[in-house]
Amino acid sequence: MSSRAGIAEGYEQIEVDVVAVWKEGYVYENRGSTSVEQKIKITKGMRNLNSETKTLTASHSIGSTISTGDLFEIATVDVSYSYSHEESQVSMTETEVYESKEIEHTITIPPTSKFTRWQLNADVGGADIEYMYLIDEVTPIGGTLSIPQVIKSRAKILVGREIYLGETEIRIKHADRKEYMTVVSRKSWPAATLGHSKLYKFVLYEDMYGFRIKTLNTMYSGYEYAYSSDQGGIYFDQGSDNPKQRWAINKSLPLRHGDVVTFMNKYFTRSGLCYYDGPATDVYCLDKREDKWILEVVKP
């Protein structure tokens, strides 16, 4: 996911409301009769960034669009504000957000004066962006401050495209092995196994009993829904009466491109979709196994 190189397949750019506040970043009262110099060091941008890919994990929701745990990347942050009866706007680019730039400079505070540095901070899904902008104000000690006020704050973020149940075509990728679920013929049934081809597509459905995984690449007409056999192998069945077709996904809706999930069978309740080196195929549903799978939206 990278906004610098254009929007990658499976992702989209959306605009969301975010929280921005003005804070007193630095305050100094010079009660002497001569000017005082002070060195100030600030960090502009995101602090404590640990992601080399710039992909962040939301620690709290962003409106109704992003839920806790969702992955996203910040493209821009824009804040409009008022100060001293004037309205202004400040923008921070992707580079400025992620570079976490340290700035040090010296200020001079006149005698019997108070220096206040206002800093504009923004919170985007738990990512704390400091010193988007700053305003320096010098007033007499005890004088009235002109406190800046945020009018509107929004961010453009990159997120995985939403997976619409019953509609969006996806690939299902094993998170550790980096191979895709494919469909082969075994015992005159379509069966799931891992492979490197990206041509195999699936659609997720949900009803009151759980999720179903439908293949769009069956070689036996009508045999489309993944279920666990009693021995654990994954085959594709017809109709909707088989309770072994139902799965639980460990993530709340909406699902998005790039989500990492597990599939637990609703019939064999302690068994999960996993890799197993079987005699002919290697996608199984086994007891106490909860392998992780990556959902990838297929480009329309």
From Swiss-Prot:
Binding sites annotated in the UniProt record for an N-(acyl)-sphingosylphosphocholine: 187, 229, 235, 284
Family: Belongs to the lysenin family.
Region (C-terminal receptor-binding domain), start-end ranges: 159-299
Major location (coarse): secreted
Compartments, as annotated in UniProt: Secreted; Target cell membrane
Identification of the protein by name: Lysenin-related protein 2
Cystine residue pairs: 274-285
Tissue expr: Expressed by coelomocytes.
Entry's Gene Ontology cellular component terms: extracellular region; membrane; other organism cell membrane
Residues covered by region (N-terminal cap domain): 12-35, 110-158
Site (Important for activity): 211
Keyword Translocase carried by entry: no
Positions of region (Beta-hairpin domain): 36-109
GO BP terms in the entry: defense response to bacterium; killing of cells of another organism; monoatomic ion transport
CDD domains (UniProt xref): PFM_lysenin-like (cd20225)
Subunit comment: Binds to sphingomyelin as a monomer by using its C-terminal domain. Forms a nonamer when sphingomyelin/LRP-2 ratio is lower than ca 500. Oligomerization, but not binding, is influenced by the fluidity of sphingomyelin.
Keyword line: Antibiotic, Antimicrobial, Cytolysis, Disulfide bond, Hemolysis, Ion transport, Membrane, Secreted, Target cell membrane, Target membrane, Toxin, Transmembrane, Transport
Annotated site, Crucial for binding sphingomyelin and inducing hemolysis, chain positions: 22, 247, 293
Sites annotated Crucial for binding sphingomyelin and important for inducing hemolysis: 189
Entry's Gene Ontology molecular function annotations: toxin activity
Job description of the protein: Pore-forming toxin that specifically binds sphingomyelin in the plasma membrane of various cells. Has hemolytic activity. It also has antibacterial activities against B.megaterium.
